[in-house]
Amino acid sequence: MYSYKYPHPSVTTDCVIFGFDGTKLHVLLVERGIDPYKGKWAFPGGFIKMDESCEEGALRELKEETGLTGAYIEQFHTFSDPNRDPRERVITVAYYVLV
């Protein structure tokens, strides 16, 4: 039998959304609505459901939090520091989105 500090890590996605208005590059942030970071600015994202891939979860969160659909999305990094989230063990798969 094995004993792990974090036997069931959660998986989340974050979307770094880039937009270009012809002169400047912009990044879209959303205001967090729940603790522990309520009121803070963050990249749109959230927890992956058990029946979806990371990309499906990223697209779902993107639509839920921003209303965006049909944008170009590409995975670019995985954040896995065991202590990066005070709530629980979380692994985040990050995507960049071009609009």
Residue ranges and their predicted role:
Residues P9-V11, E55-L59, G67-V99:
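Active-site segment of metal-dependent pyrophosphate-handling enzymes
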Residues Y2-A42, E55, G70:
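N-terminal strand-loop-strand
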Residues P44, A58, L62:
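Hydrophobic alpha-helical positions that pack around
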